[in-house]
Amino acid sequence: MEKYLVIAVGGSIGAILRYLTGVYSAKFFGTWLPYGTLIVNVVGSFILSFFMILFLEKLSLDPLWRLFVAVGFCGSYTTLSSITYETLSIVMDGDYVRALLNIALNFGLSFLSAFAGIVLARML
């Protein structure tokens, strides 16, 4: 039961932060691209990689922390379904360049962010 509670708490925090990121990124950056999804995926990729390296290689923590961060928080904070839906919406508007840019930015920057998280965690 403890595992489920840890996942639920992490998931609740991730979901709320995801919502707030979407709201405030639209206000700050506009809506030309789905910036909120881009931000949560790039930041979430970094967080997941960084903390998994810390948990697996550097720190001796209760495995519940991995569930909290990886399954709970990052599981609700990041999303592939939003990228898919938002990109298809852009395609349906006929803006193929913007759709490709959205895909490239989400996957390219998320990959680089995850790599940076691993490198930074290993430097600690």
Curated annotation (Swiss-Prot):
Sequence intervals crossing the membrane: 4-24, 36-56, 63-83, 100-120
Residues annotated for Na(+) binding in this entry: G75, T78
Substrates-to-products reaction catalysed: fluoride(in) = fluoride(out)
InterPro entries: FluC
Membrane-topology descriptor: Multi-pass membrane protein
First-listed, main subcellular location of the protein, grouped into a coarse class: membrane
UniProt-annotated location(s): Cell inner membrane
Transport as UniProt keyword: yes
Keyword Nucleotide-binding tagged: no
Gene Ontology annotations for the cellular component aspect, listed alphabetically: plasma membrane
A GO molecular function held by the record: metal ion binding
Regulation (activators, inhibitors): Na(+) is not transported, but it plays an essential structural role and its presence is essential for fluoride channel function.
GO biological process, any: cellular detoxification of fluoride
Keywords: Cell inner membrane, Cell membrane, Ion channel, Ion transport, Membrane, Metal-binding, Sodium, Transmembrane, Transmembrane helix, Transport
Family, similarity comment: Belongs to the fluoride channel Fluc/FEX (TC 1.A.43) family.
Protein name: Fluoride-specific ion channel FluC
Species for this entry: Sulfurihydrogenibium sp. (strain YO3AOP1)
